[in-house]
């Protein structure tokens, strides 16, 4: 196994995301899509980091995260808006996902995953600031903190790197986002 801690923390993020996502299927299908797609991305990412760093697996990982971003934006639009604005935002989320997925078929750099997720988190934050939901805003804040920790390259230990820290922080963010969706 190449990166055992990264595999374990990625799989833990996957387990939490899939568990919480399955609990959302009956109440918020779009947020369930976000959680389940992120869970799939974490399973694939953990497998890529630990066992098999092939291109197809990486593509599937990045595309899963794009689907998760769609679910976050569309789910937030459904929860906070109505009418024409809601249709516009969901259409935007679909277009954003299609453009991202098309781009990622030919690009591998993680910066594009960050850009897509970051823009989704910004939209989610704005929507839940407008229709105030403190749990969602806390989840977005912890997600941003997780991304910054990952980008920093900071490692708590030689066997606990920035990816591992990201996974742990993002797992906490998933609980906050779940609480916000269930509110």
Question: Where is each model-derived feature located?
Answer:
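Polytopic alpha-helical membrane-helix bundles and their juxtamembrane interface segments
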Residues: 1-39, 45-61, 66-183
């Amino acid at each position: 196994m190449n990166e055992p801690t990264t595999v374990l923390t990625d799989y833990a993020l996957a387990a939490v995301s899939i568990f919480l996502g399955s609990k959302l299927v009956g109440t918020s299908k779009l947020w369930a899509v976000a959680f389940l797609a992120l869970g799939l991305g974490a399973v694939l990412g953990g497998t890529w980091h630990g066992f098999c760093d092939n291109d197809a697996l990486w593509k599937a990982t990045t595309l899963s995260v794009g689907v998760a971003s769609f679910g976050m934006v569309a789910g937030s639009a459904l929860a906070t808006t109505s009418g024409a604005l809601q249709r516009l935002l969901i259409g935007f989320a679909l277009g954003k996902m299609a453009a991202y997925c098309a781009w990622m078929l030919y690009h591998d750099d993680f910066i594009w995953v960050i850009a897509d997720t970051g823009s989704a988190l910004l939209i989610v934050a704005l929507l839940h600031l407008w229709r105030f939901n403190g749990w969602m805003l806390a989840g977005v804040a912890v997600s941003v903190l997780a991304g910054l920790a990952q980008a920093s390259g900071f490692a708590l230990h030689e066997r606990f790197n920035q990816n591992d820290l990201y996974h742990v922080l993002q797992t906490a963010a998933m609980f906050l986002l779940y609480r916000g969706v269930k509110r």
